[in-house]
Amino acid sequence: MRITVSHDLSRIAQSLNRLSGRLNGSLEEPLRAIGGILESSTRRRIAETKTAPDGKRWADVSPATAQAKNGRGGILVDHGNLLASITHEASAKSVITGSVMGYSVYVQEGTKTMPTRPFLGLSSQDYQDIDDLMSDWLEGLIV
């Protein structure tokens, strides 16, 4: 099972593609760093902020779930499997951040009985962090 979250980054992609041609086609170094940013922010959402990438707080767990947890963890944290499964992969042309847990799609998208609790995606802070990273990286190429 795989979850895909897409964003229109066409302006950034066009600039990166032009630059990529000058760099023999590989953007793996900055894409690996972007993956690290996204992995960290995704983990922070699960472990700390309990918010979607757009900043909206997740719904509380149901009373039945709270009782079943018996004080263990919080929203999306019971044994830590989802949190531990967040990874990223970078190549010369792309970066993927996500979870290999089969149930992650139900958490991200919700079900008839479970509210959505989006954890994958880019927040406004992620965009800013990526912009800062790319500015620094490009400046390093010029200097």
Label for each model-derived stretch:
Residues 1-143:
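Short, Lys/Arg-rich flexible segments
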